[in-house]
From Swiss-Prot:
Belongs to the class-II pyridoxal-phosphate-dependent aminotransferase family. MalY/PatB cystathionine beta-lyase subfamily. This is Putative cystathionine beta-lyase. Pathway: Amino-acid biosynthesis; L-methionine biosynthesis via de novo pathway; L-homocysteine from L-cystathionine: step 1/1. It is an enzyme of class 4 (lyase). It comes from Mycobacterium leprae (strain TN).
Amino acid sequence: MTSNPLEQLTIEQLQCRTSMKWRAHPEDVLPLWVAEMDVLLAPTVAEAVHRAVDNGDTGYPYGTTFAEAISEFASQRWQWHDLDVSRTAIVPDVMLGVVEMLRLITDRGDGVIVSPPVYPPFYAFVTHDGRRVLEAPLGRDGRLDLAALQDAFSRARRSSGPNGKVAYLLCNPHNPTGSVHTVAELHGVAELARRFGVRVISDEIHAPLVLSGARFTPYLSIPGAENAFALMSATKGWNLCGLKAAIAIAGREAAADLRRIPKEVSHGPSHLGIIAHTAAFRTGSSWLDALLQGLEANRALLRDLVTKHLPGVRYQRPQGTYLTWLDCRHLGFDEQINEGLAAISDLSGPARWFLDHSRVALTSGHAFGTGGVGHVRVNFATSQAILIEALSRMGRALVNFR
């Protein structure tokens, strides 16, 4: 049995890292913000990368082994047997892949719908590429609101004109709430998209990270989603943010669109990234299972710690990802929000307060769009010792504040 990957590194070892999570703040800050995990590489992934380096295998990526590995994993893990390698393309990472898919099916000025609170780059990447962001907010329960989606699709279609195109960015599982969309919810999305002529692009980067009590359903496996796209990667499941690679997958009716993707896009992924991601999907399942057990334990621990140390803060139990969404509005902290698009590193309200007063870094909810103000996102992919210390600090700061 593989040991818990989340309990293999000390804080002293983690503080030697040079990545964003551990370098963006001073050493006295405990970082529970950006979506990096505090783990070592899965052994089989490390072996594949070391072997490539030892052999000088550091050229350009080639072939379909990455797509084949994802197809095999999807078949075994999710019983999705229709991931046809001929309908895939390698892309540098999921968000750059999203932009490339939008360029295939929309034009500058067209509307792109998102469901906030949602991953901040959904706003930034879309806007910077000249598309208009429209919102279909999640419901009060943090799940997809099909009535809001219908209203947004209808408004977007009316405002787009007779020749306008409309797209919807689905986050499946959803970041930051950790909601894993049900088959019924995804059927609802597909039916509405067909009715209003909206093309769906599904960001499924967190797909391997679904915890007990929920089941991941690939959007492209839903009847009616044949003209959609999905983006997948091992980035989140195996902590490969610095080894970039992702796959764009087209539904049967979208295959011709995907074939129009510029050839130079395939030069963007790192060859070492593709080697690492392929190894993760092919040989990393036992490590992933051990990670999921560790995340299950941390999810339960975090619930207890919030109850103990943060009275008045509402904890929303995530079904997937290693992220949870805390409603801190009852604490009454002022929000000072700058104009314009917010970045994942921007701080306001409770996130700013907890950083200043408890030396714990969280992600500020305002960056996630409508419904995010007064919330924070917590990354619980770390050791239990760090979680306990972080929540204890936050609790002590609140006691002193009051």
